[in-house]
């Protein structure tokens, strides 16, 4: 990290890149003895962006530590924001993943899930520890995500690869085919016959 003083951070306020209170929190952490106590996910995300801007590894570590704590209180209203923070910064959090796996049906019924890109949907659903009653539940989640979307055939194939088709009945496949756009139907049939076999943690 290049040397800077308090006035350098004060000048940063005039650039309108970061919020004034976020800069103050960073300043007190870097030059004072104040710890990061905020429970606001949005504030922590902005603090982490500032830490990267300043190239301050200590501040980054403290923000991650605080986010790990806040993550223990994750819920359906903030899961996607927390998930995006970890994914976009190449970070992992076992509690976050456990929450997603155990609450996948509730999560996939949120508007936040429907707004995810294909990579995030695959990252979330292509997990052997997801707890569902049957594989058709996962297929329906993908179909719901695809509603009102037009993805190219490569992305369609990619997202369908999260389905373990060995555990999908032919009648369930037929029902799914009726729900998707015509241009995807042959691809879905082909994937079904490939019979992706990796099991999940089915909840009995």
UniProtKB/Swiss-Prot annotation:
Cytoplasm recorded as keyword: no
InterPro entries noted in UniProt: BACK, Orthopox_C5
SMART domains in the record: BACK (SM00875)
Keywords (A to Z) from UniProt: Early protein
Reported induction: Expressed in the early phase of the viral replicative cycle.
One Pfam family, short name: BACK
Domain BACK, first and last residues per copy: 95-177
Top-level taxon of origin: Viruses
Family listed: Belongs to the orthopoxvirus OPG030 family.
Name of this chain's protein: Protein OPG030
Organism: Vaccinia virus (strain Copenhagen) (VACV)
Species lineage: Viruses, Varidnaviria, Bamfordvirae, Nucleocytoviricota, Pokkesviricetes
